[in-house]
Amino acid sequence: MKQFLRQTVAALAILSLVACGGGGGGSGSGGGGGTPTPSPTPTPTPTPLDDYSAPAQIALTGDQVGKIVAQAAAQARQSGHPAVIAVVDRVGNVLAVFRMTGAPAGAKIPDAPDGNNIDIQGLTVPAEAAAIAKAVTGAYLSSGGNAFSSRTASMIVQQHFPPAPSTAGLESGPLFGVQFSQLPCSDFSQRFQAGGAGALIGPKRSPLGLAADPGGFPLYIGGVLVGGIGVLSDGDYGFDPNVLDTDTDHDERIALAGTVGFEAPAAIRADRIYVDGTQLRYTDSLYSSLFDVTGATWAQTAPALGALVAVRGYFETAALRAGTAYGAEASGVRAAKASEFADRDAFVFTDGSGANRYPLRAGTDAADVAQPLTQAEATALLEEAFAVMTRARAQIRQPLDSRAQVTISLVDTRGAVLGMVRSPDAPVFGADVSLQKARTAAFFSGSHAAADLTADPSADVQGFVAKVRAFLGDPTALTGTFAFADRSGGNLSRPYFPDGQVGNPPGPLSRPIAQWNPFTTGLQSALVLTNLGQHLQYVTGASATDTPQRCTLLPDAAPSQNRLQNGTQIFPGSVPVYRGNVLVGGIGVSGDGIDQDDMISFLGTNNAGVRVGSIGNAPAAIRADRIVVTVGGASVRLRYVGCPFAPFLDSSQQNVCQGL
């Protein structure tokens, strides 16, 4: 498959998608663009919130989308770097893909450091796919309390944090592995529909997951997040390995020009946010370095500088589209009804017709578990985790001492969703990621992990079982003898073990450092390689069939359901759920700092156990932090969870997870 993928996609992905598109369209009038917005079920009147404020329901109009594209194109024209420009709304609907005359057809993914490419390293992918992924990244990583760019993403996914030649020895980025989320195969992420009530339902998938290549920014109107812009002009789709220098990146400058008038508030940009004492990076470009693009108009831009183009599976219109307002029924994310979740601050994911996509329910795994989770237990787990979140001090939000905002997902041992809930303004990326985390904790804690991996048709995937067993010195590893939180599995998924310690071998679920970059992480990337290949062939027109809406080729645990249907995740924020010493599920959290995510999942599970008396965290004796690995003569213990200092806004408590 790898050789076929490399030969087919590398040849076909460089093809221009202009032929698929047609000419440029007008922006229309009344803010609607050329494509009318469907009429979904009206959003219920929200109940007043207790702890949070819901974002105003504001959406980009077609005229505004045209203005954003025109400004970016004006910067590209004056700098002599024709570009592909994509705009999305907050839930990932693609509102425009504009190809300037002379823009590159493809974008090259970096080779492996040692030249031995694996997974998607070295491929050339469609420039349109890269631009969309950058736009999605800018929108999905941001919120009303934080504005992150694809340059920010680059900083937090590499083998050292911050990434720089002088930081060897430091641990990996806090969101190491998040680039393999929002995947085109995800069973959670929605897919483009040409019309009907579900046309704008999100969150939508990304063709390449999240991007680490600079040139993607969020878009705001009056401080309200409304979408993202992504640009590809240089023919490369990579990452920035050194934050100590200042790049002249034309993708980034062109995208930044598109945000003029739609800028992120300065107070919430990434460079106002610190993680472990390190200031995050938002952009290497300044607004003062841009050409004056304020007079650019859509009428001057199309067809003079290029045309809108169709992108199969994402954008199939010859006209600009208006976005949908996040929080409205049409967006797929809205305030929960009282009948759906007890806390008045809760938001849920909907189908556009009023129904909650993931209502609270009991476990589906009665054939595998003597006593599956009951609906009452599932309710307790999500309610208690939500309650911890409302008290938690955020790490990545401004102003300081804001409340954490996350998405929380609960699954059974088969990976079936038993409920999902989120705060009103949690970053969108955390939805798919929280589900990945929940499934990952349940998967690696289960008795079936080794058998499932061995049943995958890829010899590469199969080989990770033997690597784990040899590394841990345990021939029974991955058969349910230990409980793995995502932090534990993440320890084994870094190119150095222990994390960041140069000169040490890789964890058994990682690629060696000589081969590693953000485009091949190890088991995580190997599991979805076939899906990515299928999808890129579909996007380029090489195949009439898209990848199924289920990631990985693992065997089914239930009809049409494998245990990792949206992939796996390798940074902290989940724990398995037990009834005594029997695994019954997993809970995942994502959207704030990794210690906050860990605390919400761990304390939420503990508190649910106190409340219902029948479930809880894994017994201490079987947690992965009882596993000790000998490396270079030293004994290294895996980690289970890590909870933050001064975690709560309403209490001076410390060490809140200790002893539980």
Model-derived features: positions:
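Bacterial N-terminal signal peptides that target proteins for export
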Residues: 1-9
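C-terminal motif of bacterial Sec signal peptides marking the signal peptidase cleavage site
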Residues: 16-19
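Bacterial signal peptide processing site
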Residues: 21-26
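Non-catalytic, C-terminal membrane-associated alpha-helical segments of glycosyltransferases
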Residues: 30-31
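Flexible, solvent-exposed loop/hinge segments and secondary-structure transition points
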Residues: 36, 42-660
